[in-house]
Amino acid sequence: MTISLKVLAPNKNVYQGEAEEVILPSTTGQLGILPGHISLVTAIDIGVLRVRINSQWKSIALMGGFAEIESDEVIVLVNNAEIGSEINVQNAEQDLKEAKLAISKFSENEKNPEKIKALKEVSKAEARIQAAKN
């Protein structure tokens, strides 16, 4: 048995295919999905979606969104996403360095919108790096 998986971003169909297993980065932690899963809707965090196809894993960096799970179908609607094998690791590592540098300009307890934006950019860069290396 397999799961039908669709990963959709506003301007593109990121991924569509069959999977043996899907692991989603939900806002409450990792969510493993096998065929026959109960129906549910969940918020997706910035992180890595992992898909098992023919006993091999494929990674997709997700930038937040929602997922709808129905028995043997998963539809993921995200702000943006990148297939791990298409990510330039050097660019992602440079983005991570720049975001960490931006954070270092603020005090630890400071709640500045620019600091919050930089923290989000760190999460995005880390997800891209992790997806590219898996």
Curated annotation (Swiss-Prot):
Gene3D superfamilies: F0F1 ATP synthase delta/epsilon subunit, N-terminal. CDD domains: F1-ATPase_delta (cd12152). It is a peripheral membrane protein. GO terms for cellular component: plasma membrane-derived thylakoid membrane; proton-transporting ATP synthase complex. InterPro entries: ATP_synth_F1_dsu/esu, ATP_synth_F1_dsu/esu_N, ATPsynth_dsu/esu_N. The keyword Iron does not apply. It is found in: Cellular thylakoid membrane. GO terms for molecular function: ATP binding; proton-transporting ATP synthase activity, rotational mechanism. Its main location: membrane. Keywords: ATP synthesis, CF(1), Hydrogen ion transport, Ion transport, Membrane, Thylakoid, Transport. Belongs to the ATPase epsilon chain family. F-type ATPases have 2 components, CF(1) - the catalytic core - and CF(0) - the membrane proton channel. CF(1) has five subunits: alpha(3), beta(3), gamma(1), delta(1), epsilon(1). CF(0) has three main subunits: a, b and c. Produces ATP from ADP in the presence of a proton gradient across the membrane. This is ATP synthase epsilon chain. It comes from Prochlorococcus marinus (strain MIT 9301).
